[in-house]
Amino acid sequence: MVSLFWQTTGTGDRDLVLLHGWGLNAEVWSYIVPRLATHFRLHLVDLPGYGRSRGYGALTLEEMAEEVASRAPHGALWLGWSLGGLVATTVARRCPHAVAGLVTVASSPRFCADGDWPGIRPEVLEGFARELRQDFTRTVSRFLGLQTLGTASARQDTRWLKSVVLAHPAPAIEVLTGGLALLRTSDVRKALDQLDVPLLRLYGYLDGLVPRKVVPLVDELSTASHSIVFAGAAHAPFISHPVPFCQALCDFSQLES
């Protein structure tokens, strides 16, 4: 039997659904929940197969989007980090009438490098998938290290991310390799131009997984969207730069209210 973990907290009058990235769970948002809880009703979700959402196998992007959208309040803002950004974008494309606004964080419509499109080399993601079967802890630790690489608080932030992963049972290898496959193969670039919801895109200047070179390319794909690049941040700007990150969210919410 499948069970989707969904926790609601906060005293604000605006619903905000938060979707985490690959290998993690909703505990990753605990770093900024206290800052956001007075502004929003926060909906903290473990993506299917991750954290406390048990009983799922590897899902497609469409299946994952359908699963989380079925539980969400109508008219919410949606925020997706990394892989969660692909899921949130798919929700906004499928159900624009139910989404008041979309925020993607350190996310790309295509994560994998492709010709002139900057991104993660395919062989890197394929290597992670192979290594997962041999040593889960080491592979996830290496991936988390890449997310904070270059920031002033890299060591501290990586330790904190590892504690989030270890706080709950590890996802099944099938789910993790399926998630890596989504990062390797998903391409929602065409969908961006067709989105009928306000879009804010947040990036880290030092991000090694979603390089800043992608920002002007997505600007061209989604001319109505707005992008912010946090100097000194990498793949997890909400951890390394929580104050300006939360301010950007609150400003976006007020503009779209």
Curated annotation (Swiss-Prot):
Mention one GO molecular function. pimelyl-[acyl-carrier protein] methyl ester esterase activity
The family database entries (Pfam families) matched by this protein are listed as: Abhydrolase_1 (PF00561)
* Catalytic activity as recorded in UniProt: 6-carboxyhexanoyl-[ACP] methyl ester + H2O = 6-carboxyhexanoyl-[ACP] + methanol + H(+)
Subcellular location(s): the record lists:
Cytoplasm
Per the UniProt entry, the Enzyme Commission number(s) are 3.1.1.85
Complex formation: Monomer.
In its UniProt entry, what is this protein called? Pimeloyl-[acyl-carrier protein] methyl ester esterase
The organism that produces this protein has a lineage beginning with: Bacteria, Pseudomonadati, Pseudomonadota, Gammaproteobacteria, Enterobacterales
Give me the gene this protein comes from: bioH
